[in-house]
């Protein structure tokens, strides 16, 4: 969402698929929300500020609000990203049906619980790592969320990966960078 690096399309689409089935909403929606969040951190215009819009918006705001498509013109050029917006819920329901048909417990324990936990991590970060108009680092949230609580560093320089050894997102970017030659 910060255009910090460019990765091969096959890796982008691979990650897009897993973000899709984790129910984070279409990538276009997530990126637009994140870019808007950086524009309006913890104000009434912040799309997922728990302080102005409530905890539910921090938890599931990516799939509950309308977005400004002008913020994601770069992603709208990509056919797969546009298809993901159009068929988002179709894929979610088909995936759920496949898991349920294999074993109903897969639907709950291999999908809904992990997806819900991932969203819980995000909402914890937005609830406890933002106070006032400034993002803060919170060591305990950082430890519990494997790096997501070190949020002030992200707001100081959003294009920098790896702010802390526990930052798994930064570790993933570094791994992709060394293995896939991100330009």
Regions of interest found by a model, annotated:
Residues 1-124, 128, 160-183:
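Non-catalytic, topology-defining segments of multipass membrane proteins
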Residues 132-157:
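Active-site-proximal inter-transmembrane loops
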């Amino acid at each position: 969402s910060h255009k910090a690096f460019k990765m091969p399309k096959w890796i982008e689409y691979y990650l897009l698929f897993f973000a899709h089935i984790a129910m984070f909403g279409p990538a276009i929606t997530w990126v637009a929300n994140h870019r808007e969040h950086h524009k309006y951190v913890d104000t009434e215009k912040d799309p997922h500020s728990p302080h102005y819009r409530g905890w539910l918006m921090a938890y599931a705001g990516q799939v509950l609000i309308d977005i400004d498509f002008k913020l994601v013109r770069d992603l709208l050029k990509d056919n797969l990203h546009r298809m993901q917006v159009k068929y988002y819920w179709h894929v979610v329901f088909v995936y759920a049906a496949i898991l349920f048909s294999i074993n109903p417990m897969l639907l709950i324990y291999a999908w809904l619980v992990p997806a819900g936990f991932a969203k819980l991590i995000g909402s914890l970060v937005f609830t406890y790592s933002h106070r006032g108009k400034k993002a803060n680092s919170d060591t305990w949230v950082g430890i519990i969320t494997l790096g997501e609580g070190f949020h002030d560093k992200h707001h100081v320089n959003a294009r920098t990966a790896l702010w802390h050894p526990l930052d798994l997102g930064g570790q993933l970017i570094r791994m992709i960078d060394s293995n896939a030659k991100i330009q």
